[in-house]
Swiss-Prot record:
Keywords: Riboflavin biosynthesis, Transferase. Its EC number is 2.5.1.78. One of its GO terms (biological process) is riboflavin biosynthetic process. It catalyses: (2S)-2-hydroxy-3-oxobutyl phosphate + 5-amino-6-(D-ribitylamino)uracil = 6,7-dimethyl-8-(1-D-ribityl)lumazine + phosphate + 2 H2O + H(+). This is 6,7-dimethyl-8-ribityllumazine synthase. Forms an icosahedral capsid composed of 60 subunits, arranged as a dodecamer of pentamers. GO terms for cellular component: cytosol; riboflavin synthase complex. Belongs to the DMRL synthase family. It comes from Stenotrophomonas maltophilia (strain R551-3). Pathway: Cofactor biosynthesis; riboflavin biosynthesis; riboflavin from 2-hydroxy-3-oxobutyl phosphate and 5-amino-6-(D-ribitylamino)uracil: step 1/2. The active site is at residue 89. (2S)-2-hydroxy-3-oxobutyl phosphate binds at residues 86-87, 128.
Length: 155
C-alpha cells in the first residue's frame, strides 16, 4: 500500500500566481501580503511570485483559466472578499466564483486555491485577514505549497 501526503517542500524554480481582486482592497491587500510572506517564508523567491489584480471576485475564474492554460505556474492562489449586502448579488458572485475556480482546477490540473472570503459583515472579513482568525492568504499559500508537493509525488 502506498501513502501520499504533501508537505511544504517545493522546487525552488516553482512559480506561483497570486490572483487578487481589487474590490474590498483593504481586505485583499492584507490577504496578498499574507500569501507573499508565507511563500517567501517557505523558500519561494520573490521573482517566482506573480501578483495579478482583477476588478472583483467575478473576474477571478477567467484570469485563473488563462494562467492555468499557460502552464507557467505550479499553483494559482485566488484572493478576494465578497460581503453580503441587501440583495442576492452576494450569493451569485460567491457561488459562481467558487464553481468557476473549481472548474479551472479540474480542467487544467493546476492547483487553484480558493481564498475568496464570503462573509456576512466587514468585521468577519477583517477577522480572517490578519485578525482573530488569522490570515486566509497565509493559509492558502501553505495549501498551495502542499498541493504542488503532493501532485509531484502522485503517479
Amino acid at each position: 500500500m502506498s501513502h501520499y501526503e504533501g508537505d511544504l517542500r517545493t522546487p525552488e524554480s516553482a512559480r506561483f500566481a497570486i490572483l487578487a481582486s481589487r474590490w474590498n482592497a483593504r481586505i485583499t491587500d492584507t490577504l496578498v501580503a499574507g500569501a507573499r510572506q508565507s511563500l517567501a517564508g517557505n523558500g519561494i523567491a520573490e521573482a517566482n511570485i506573480d501578483v495579478i489584480r482583477v476588478p472583483g471576485a467575478w473576474e477571478l475564474p477567467l484570469v485563473a483559466a488563462r494562467l492555468a492554460a499557460a502552464h507557467e505556474h505550479a499553483a494559482i492562489l485566488t484572493l478576494g472578499c465578497v460581503i453580503r449586502g441587501d440583495t442576492r448579488h452576494y450569493e451569485h458572485v460567491a457561488d459562481r466564483c467558487a464553481e468557476g475556480l473549481m472548474r479551472v482546477q479540474l480542467d487544467f490540473g493546476v492547483p487553484v486555491l480558493n481564498g475568496v472570503l464570503a462573509v456576512e459583515r466587514a468585521e468577519d472579513a477583517e477577522a480572517r485577514a490578519g485578525g482573530s482568525h488569522g490570515n486566509k492568504g497565509e493559509e492558502v499559500a501553505l495549501a498551495a505549497l502542499e498541493m504542488v508537493n503532493l501532485l509531484e509525488q502522485l503517479p
